[in-house]
Structure formats: structure tokens, C-alpha cells
């Protein structure tokens, strides 16, 4: 194994406290050397909470605060990757506050990444959705031992996000029926551009992708952990709509905003949590499996936090305080990176259009050529049929005399 290998975690969070405390600690205890946090305009207890968490982890935890900039996730991620200054010996693991890595007992992602060859620039892993209880309290650590239900997604679903959103809103499809896309861990050492959500490595395009077996490494994802978090997501969806993001960007949160606007969010929660009274309206329920792997994986993290000087009960009393920019130039830097991204995406889109138009023109010419060949073949068939007909043979002398008279 490469002794100089480092694994650096990166999480972008907005109003994610106290869950963020748990996910950062879980990553630092088990899998990564450092965690960088981009606190994006949080207005809850995130700022004070991160300061207290930094007292525990010291230099292993770095915080960048950003305020007043739209949620340009790809540009923000690229900025932090530049600040990290990762080398080719480093791997970047981008995770969300509601994601927790699961490995077989006693193993770390470090061992797996250490065996990945130099030709691989990214490592792909699977993400499974977990289902929460109807009255879940994120501040009560004892309740995490109840999270044993893993959603069984229907992998035959491959529909556009707008159709998925409409079907879920109507209740004909359950949110947990939809598979969550796999994600990638990427190698450092150069300009890196990750898609939103870290589902795809856009740059560099060179290099192969290594795929991890889910038995060795997967992530437990809690998209709907509590009713309080559900309302936060709906509020974030409203922000995305107001800022003019397309419907596919954060489509889940935009869908929750629409459900909230029509008074259907409470019924949605009943159909997507365990132990709630029956939903008020028709709707499908998720397929589930009893799985203790998350409970087993999170137990050491809960024990560690229980032994720290900062008691988790303080999470209830942290005052909401907007997080200002850590760096004066952070907003400008992200704006500049975003502009570069827009230009790059526009160039790529134009190239795609040109290729598509060329392909369409080639297809059109091939179709026209096919029609002409078919017409020529039909004409030749008719000519041969006429030449072999009895009337044609009987009138051959007459045609010969006619040619002589000319």
C-alpha cells in the first residue's frame, strides 16, 4: 500500500446541524485523514457547532464559510478542490451530511484505495437509501439504533426526473422506489471537475474508472431522516426555484417544495417513514429489507461522541447564526469558476449539437440514397420483366423494321 496516500473528505452543507456532526465524525474516525467543510449560508447552529467540532479534531477539520452566493455546487466543489491542493497520492471523497460509509467490520476505504492502480482516476461505489421513523429526533443518539430498514429500489426505473417527480407527487410511485445514483471518489493531482452530487467525473476525461463491490464499500443515505429535515429540504427547493435553477437540478427538493405549497407534505411524510398513521390519500409504500449494517457501522461514532466534552444535548441550544464568508474572495472565486463552467458547458453543448446535426445529416443522406437505390432496383426489375414478356418477344421483328426505316 502507498504510505503517502491521503484520503480527504469534502462536504458541502446548508442548515445540516446536528446531523453534520455525526457524518463528519464518522468519516474522520473510520475512513479519511481530513475533512473540508463548505458551510453554505447556514442559518442554524452549524457555525457554532463546527467551531466546537474543530476543537476536537484540530487541523484534521477545515471549514470554509460562504454566504450570499447561489448554490452552484459544481463551482463550489471545484474551488475547494483547488484549496485542498491534493496530489496524485490523494483521493477525494465527497459526501453529504446524510451519508455514512459502510464497510465490513474492521476495514477502511483506505485499504481498498491503496490497492487501486495508477491508471484509475476515479472509484465508483453504490449508494443505498435508508428509511427513517416517523418521529425521528436527530439530536437523540439512541434513536439511530432504530434505523434498520433499507429501501429496495426498483432498478428498472429509468425515467426523466420530471416524470419521476410527477408520479411521486401523484402517489403512483414511492420516492424510495427510485434508485439513488452511484457516486465516485476521485484522485487528486490536477484540475478536477465533478458533476453535482459527485455522480460523475467530468474532468479529467483520461483515466479509467474502478468499481467497488457493494459488499466491500457502500454508503447508507438518509434522504428523508426526519420531518424537520423534510421541511428544510422543501425550503431549499423553494430557493432553487427562485434562483432559476432548471427543474432537474435538485429535483427532489423542488418536488418537496411543490408538495408543501399544495399542503401535501404531511401525507408524503406518512408514506415515506415507518410507524406513522396511514396516509390520508392513496399512495404506494416502499419495499424494505431489515439490514443492521448501518446500526453496526455508526455505533463506534456514537460512542466516541458520547465521550467528548461537548454533550450532544447542546445541539438543541445552539443559536441560529448566519455563516459569513471565510475568505473575502470566496464568492468572487466561485462566481469566476461558475462563469468558466458556463462557457465550458456551452462549448461542449455546441460541439454535441454539431455532432448531432452532422449525424442527422448523414442519416438523412443515407435514407435518400436508400430510397434512390430502391427506386432504381424497381425500375430494373420492371425493365427485365418487360423484356422477358411474350408481347415483347413477338414484336421484336416489328421494332427492328422500325429502326431500319428511321
Regions from the PLM with identified roles:
Residues 33-44, 64-66:
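Short beta-strand/loop segment that forms part of the nucleotide-sugar
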Residues 33, 90, 121:
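Short acidic/polar active-site loop segments enriched in Thr and Asp
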Residues 96-100:
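The conserved acidic donor/metal-binding loop of glycosyltransferases
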Residues 25-34:
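Short, acidic, metal-binding catalytic loop of nucleotide-sugar glycosyltransferases
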Residues 49-94:
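Active-site-proximal specificity loops/subdomain of glycosyltransferases
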Residues 1-25:
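N-proximal low-complexity "stem/linker" segments adjacent to membrane-targeting elements
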Residues 74-76, 103-321, 328:
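Catalytic-site signature of metal-activated, phosphate-bearing donor transferases
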Residues 310-406:
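Boundary detector for helix-to-coil junctions that initiate low-complexity/charged tails
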Amino acid at each position: 500500500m502507498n504510505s503517502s496516500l491521503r484520503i480527504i473528505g469534502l462536504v458541502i452543507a446548508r442548515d445540516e446541524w446536528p446531523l453534520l456532526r455525526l457524518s463528519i465524525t464518522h468519516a474522520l474516525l473510520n475512513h479519511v485523514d481530513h475533512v473540508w467543510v463548505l458551510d453554505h449560508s447556514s442559518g442554524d447552529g452549524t457555525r457554532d457547532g463546527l467551531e466546537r467540532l474543530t476543537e476536537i479534531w484540530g487541523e484534521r477539520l477545515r471549514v470554509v464559510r460562504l454566504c450570499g452566493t447561489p448554490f452552484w455546487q459544481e463551482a463550489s466543489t471545484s474551488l475547494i478542490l483547488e484549496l485542498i491542493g491534493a496530489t496524485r497520492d490523494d483521493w477525494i471523497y465527497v459526501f453529504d451530511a446524510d451519508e455514512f460509509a459502510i464497510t465490513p467490520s474492521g476495514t477502511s476505504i483506505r485499504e481498498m484505495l491503496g490497492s487501486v492502480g495508477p491508471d484509475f482516476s476515479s472509484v465508483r461505489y453504490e449508494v443505498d437509501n435508508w428509511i427513517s421513523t416517523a418521529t425521528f429526533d436527530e439530536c437523540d443518539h439512541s434513536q439511530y439504533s432504530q434505523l434498520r430498514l433499507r429501501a429496495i429500489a426498483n432498478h428498472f426505473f429509468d425515467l426523466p426526473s420530471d416524470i419521476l417527480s410527477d408520479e411521486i407527487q401523484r402517489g403512483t410511485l414511492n420516492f424510495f422506489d427510485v434508485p439513488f445514483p452511484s457516486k465516485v471518489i476521485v484522485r487528486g493531482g490536477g484540475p478536477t471537475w465533478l458533476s453535482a452530487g459527485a455522480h460523475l467525473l467530468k474532468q479529467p476525461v483520461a483515466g479509467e474508472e474502478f468499481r467497488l463491490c457493494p459488499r466491500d464499500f457502500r454508503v447508507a443515505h438518509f434522504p428523508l431522516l426526519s420531518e424537520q429535515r423534510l421541511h428544510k429540504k422543501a425550503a431549499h427547493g423553494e430557493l432553487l426555484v427562485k434562483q432559476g435553477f432548471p427543474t432537474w437540478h435538485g429535483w427532489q427538493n423542488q418536488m418537496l417544495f411543490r408538495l408543501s405549497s399544495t399542503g401535501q407534505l404531511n401525507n408524503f411524510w406518512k408514506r415515506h417513514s415507518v410507524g406513522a398513521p396511514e396516509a390520508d390519500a392513496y399512495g404506494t409504500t416502499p419495499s424494505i429489507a431489515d439490514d443492521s449494517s448501518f446500526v453496526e457501522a455508526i455505533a463506534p461514532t456514537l460512542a466516541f461522541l458520547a465521550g467528548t466534552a461537548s454533550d450532544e444535548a447542546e445541539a438543541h441550544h445552539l443559536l441560529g447564526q448566519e455563516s459569513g464568508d471565510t475568505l473575502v474572495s470566496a464568492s468572487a472565486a466561485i462566481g469566476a469558476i461558475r462563469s468558466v463552467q458556463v462557457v465550458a458547458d456551452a462549448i461542449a453543448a455546441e460541439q454535441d449539437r454539431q455532432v448531432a446535426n452532422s449525424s442527422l445529416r448523414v442519416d438523412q443522406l443515407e435514407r435518400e440514397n436508400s430510397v434512390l437505390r430502391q427506386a432504381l432496383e424497381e425500375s430494373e426489375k420492371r425493365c427485365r420483366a418487360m423484356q422477358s414478356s411474350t408481347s415483347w418477344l413477338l414484336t421484336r421483328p416489328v421494332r427492328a423494321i422500325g429502326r431500319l426505316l428511321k
